[in-house]
Amino acid sequence: FAVLYRTNSQSRAIEDALRKKNIDYKIYGGISFYQRKEIKDLLSYLRMLINPNDEEALKRIINYPARGIGATTIDKLTIAANHYKKSIFDVIKNLDKIDLKINSGTKTKLQNFLNMILRFQIDMKKLNAFEVADLVIKQTKLVKDLEKDGTPEAVSKVENVQELLNGIKDFITDKIEEGEDASLTAFLEEVALATDLDADKKDDKLRVSLMSIHQSKGLEYPYVYVVGLEENLFLRQ
């Protein structure tokens, strides 16, 4: 079986649906929706709000979009965290007590990053998961950073970010209807499970193939499903 779509962002809904039905799939000539860089970047921001001690997430976003916090500063933060047996986030919170031997400009940038995360955590208490993600995108100017290249790839990345927002909105709707937890934490747990399942898949197992129309050229399958046959979306008018 093969499922074809026009844009890569359309794979999110298909992947989620197949996963819920325990149907194995593979992304032909590409990577899973939740493994795409722009998606992992936004998810890292959301993970930081739930657990500021998530150092993998912190290192991914502390200088993205670029805010002048370089690799040398991150190394100093890591060394200090190991020395004082604290998380990197705790080190940043205690810059007035820990001498990192950094200049005042860098210290200000770290303080601004800290304040941003703390503000998001406060806002998170009164917003749902979708609203939090939307706020993060706007306040960090993540989409603007993606758009600045002006390339087709940049457009695709922006579409992916928008599709993640759609996914969060769908998650909230489904969970509320089912009377289950619709929090940001619950969403991130579901994404983490999906990511783990993707990592466990073996190449030799029979799976549904997901791919864009462009990637399907020259390939043949007994059964082919084409999704998103909509005006202004599928090919050109």
Residue ranges and their predicted role:
Residues 1-59, 148-159, 166, 182-183, ...:
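Conserved motor-region signature of P-loop NTPase helicases/translocases
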Residues 5, 104, 228:
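Conserved residues at beta->alpha junctions
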Residues 40-44, 207-236:
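A short beta-strand element within the Helicase C-terminal
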Residues 65, 95-215, 236-237:
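Accessory C-terminal helicase-associated subdomains
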Residues 75-80, 93:
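C-terminal helical "lid" of AAA+/P-loop NTPase domains
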